Amino acid sequence: MLVADLHHFLDLPDDIPGPARRLAEHLSSIVRAATGGDAGTAWMSALPCRRRPGNRSCPGRMVVLRPEPASVIHWECSTCHDEGVISNWGDSPDDLRRRKLTVAGALNEIDLTDAVASALRDLRLLDTDSERVVFAVRADGERIVLTATDDELDQLIGLVAAEANHETNRRRQPRLDAAFDALSVAHAAGG
């Protein structure tokens, strides 16, 4: 079991070794998923497991639990059962909890591929509300499901389009285009 204090992984120096940086990114993603999704119940996020048993990627997904009132975040891989807790995450840059009440609208469920979900998590220009939608993406059996209102989906599509239009990396451009196409087609079809 990994016991981590998130504050130890914030503001890391540029020369930090790769494994430590990847662990920090993994813990950051877990906190974002746990705070972007429901509190009080364990749910399976679309975040992949980072372990490589036998030099092969673990096919598992991160199951996260954020108790209410806020304390430590529990996480566990659905396949290899790698697990841990993260403390001191409240009010960090990775804390995506809503700060005020919002009006709930009708939700659309959109099926995504692993590649599209990964591209959405890698977006750099997301506001907090869109980041919450992206990190609350769930794995449901073989499906990966993004749940969003029409307004949230419009906002996310606009942000993906803006980033895709300004992307100079030729490897990243097709991933952003695929994410834009998947969201646009699903939105046009009504979710």
Where does each model-flagged region fall?
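Short, intrinsically disordered terminal segments enriched in charged and Pro/Gly residues
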Residues: 1-45, 89-100
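Acidic, aromatic-enriched beta-alpha/helix-loop junctions
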Residues: 46-48, 65, 142-145
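Short cysteine-rich clusters marking metal-coordination/redox-active sites
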Residues: 46-53, 77-80
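Short, compact, well-ordered microdomains
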Residues: 60-96, 163-182
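Positively charged, low-complexity terminal tracts
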Residues: 96-191
